[in-house]
Amino acid sequence: MKIRADNNLGYWLFYSQRSVAYAFSEVLRQVCLEHKKPYIITPSQWGVLSLLFETGEITIGAISQRRGVDAPTITGVVKRLEQSGLVERVHDRGDRRVVKVSLTDEGKSIMDLLAEPVDAFNDILTHGFSEAEQSDFRTNLQRIIANVSAVAPGTGDRFGLLPRGFHCGELE
């Protein structure tokens, strides 16, 4: 066998993603416990909350597109956040058929509490990496995503999140 797990980039990407997700879950959990919240925020929920914190009201379809996650999955995440009192669904003023999601006061409060620990966690992840190395790393990850589309159409950048200049599925 030519490639072993310890030499396989896909393995290391998978392993690092799992490690980061687990550690991030713990950071989020600790903040909720320290502040005696009746809920625990997951990384997926934090992704939705952070987008709402940045944008205000937004549709589930837009959340799906911006976070690169299928709409039915986002619907479930939003439902759990709504049950925890962190978000609410509101009808668009201009078109009552359109439903948007927004943060409640409690949602804004938890995002304020999470800001510093999340920033500190990101600092831990990037410790020892220069700004240029961090930028190169992001670019290389984006290249990998673009390359994946060449071998598995419909995967890779199916949500169009890569910056311009990345051509999915066009390996030389």
Residue map of PLM features:
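N-terminal helix-turn-helix DNA-binding core of bacterial DNA-binding proteins
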Residues: 22-73, 84, 155-159
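Charged, amphipathic alpha-helical coiled-coil/dimerization segments
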Residues: 79-143
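N-terminal leader segment of winged-helix/HTH proteins
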Residues: 1-39, 166-172
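Active-site phosphate/pyrophosphate-handling residues
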Residues: 8, 47, 72, 109, ...
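Alpha-helical linker/hinge and terminal dimerization helices associated
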Residues: 16, 20, 27, 31, ...
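C-terminal regulatory/oligomerization modules of transcriptional regulators
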Residues: 1-4, 132-172
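Hydrophobic structural patches
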Residues: 13, 49-52, 141
